[in-house]
């Protein structure tokens, strides 16, 4: 989820030119449609164009507000779907990463940890994976390769152990957007050191899943590849060989742009062959997940078909690690269509996770926190249809 980072991204829209990898077009976009020198505005879909390096083989926009010049339509259906059940279906747990910029912050004031009673409620309903967001700055204060903070690690471990002690999967989500103290992570050795310590701590728990980072964005594409590979290598070298690893892509790891933005990630290698490509998808006009309005009843299906084809063509499997929609009939139909498509293609889609639960979400438009979260009260009965 973009959180306040999204606001910062849109705030740059009034600049004269879009920076490297930033948005430069799309329905409802009001920022600059030109890019800095060496980059060109590339059409990805009707809602999102991005400043990408030249030369490029992708189709580009020509004038501000214009549609792309030679855009081909996405495939209407994927090939050879395989119906079945999901391996994982669950809920994001978001609260330990709250209090952005308040580091280390105070537990109970700036951040908290998930409610085990709420997680138990979800487990009782059949959900079997929980993606636990946390802050790298709190776990490794001041330096990315620093020793872990004992108190924060203990609280994180207690949450993980509660989930896995019930026989369910706990995904460790460094919710940092490829950044550390607001700066893009470029020190691959320090990044690897972080994952060496994290994997060493959890290596004996086979129900732990490692996520390399939440929603890389506006970054050099090769750097995104290198950070993912560094995390994979560090996790395996630390002895965590039985666990799955989730890799994420650039452009907020969006499913709707994956096949044209993150194609190089197909070359990632895991000696244990347990990589899962995690994508996120929201259904509002700009895909940001900040509105209760969905574009149409078909938008969910439309936005994941390209990713389905990419996974199958490259022999990969994926997880929709974040999705949500407003509490209304249009979004409900869009979500149901999207989830049904993923389930019908369960040879390449391992599952999906709603964004988000957590005790501090209050009246947030997608809150899945029992008993009264808006998303929970509106969507729980629907989502239970898809649990493994």
From Swiss-Prot:
Disulfide bond residue pairs: 24-41, 35-51
Positions of the UniProt region annotated as Catalytic: 92-388
Family listed: Belongs to the glycosyl hydrolase 5 (cellulase A) family.
Active site: 215, 322
Chain spans, region Linker: 53-91
Residue ranges constituting the CBM1 domain according to the UniProt record: 17-52
Single annotated GO MF: cellulose binding
Glycosylation sites (chain numbering): 92, 155, 259
Region (Disordered): 56-81
EC number in record: 3.2.1.4
Practical use: Used as a detergent cellulase. Sold under the name Celluzyme by Novozymes. This special enzyme has three effects: colour brightening, softening and removal of particulate soil. The overall effect is that it helps to preserve the nice appearance of new fabric and restores old fabric so that it looks new again.
GO term, biological process aspect, one: cellulose catabolic process
Protein's name according to its UniProt entry: Endoglucanase 3
GO CC annotation: extracellular region
Keywords of this entry: Carbohydrate metabolism, Cellulose degradation, Disulfide bond, Glycoprotein, Glycosidase, Hydrolase, Polysaccharide degradation, Signal
